[in-house]
Amino acid sequence: PLLFSLTMSFHDWPVVGERTFVGLDNYRTMLFDDPQFWESLWITAKFAAIYVPFNIVMSFFIALMLHHANAWSGFFRTAFYLPSVISGVALVTIWSWIYSREYGLLNFMLSFVGIDGPNWLGDPGLAIVAIIIASLWGFGGTMLILLTGLKAIPKELYEAATVSGVPGWAQM
């Protein structure tokens, strides 16, 4: 698929009809003639700059709590991981319903405290925040990877750090 996509990028390839080799013309058009490319690149950079740190910090914090918990850790591990395996179509449907301006759950809850809910997905400033929150829904995969890494650390290392006088949080 990667090589096929690369091949397609050097062609004008209509849905019906013959393809025409155009060389680097598609890339020139994208970089110099299409303002939407730069806008979408900027939005993607903002998304990544906000989402990645939040995802890692939140996943690490939850993994750390589950690593030290005993009683209900299996239940919570499953509860946090389960949303990350939900189908993408189902996830989009659920979050579209939550963010809907007319009948959305979020605006319905805000109406109880007298707040007229905004258009979460229609306002460009709020849409990026709404999408980041919806994307963080699946942080369970990252959390599970970090939890597995924490479980792989031998207990002897923690014991040696404790004997050496290293405080609890600094042991990380």
Question: Regions from the language model: what does each represent?
Answer:
Residues 1-172:
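A structural signal for multi-pass alpha-helical bundles of membrane permease subunits
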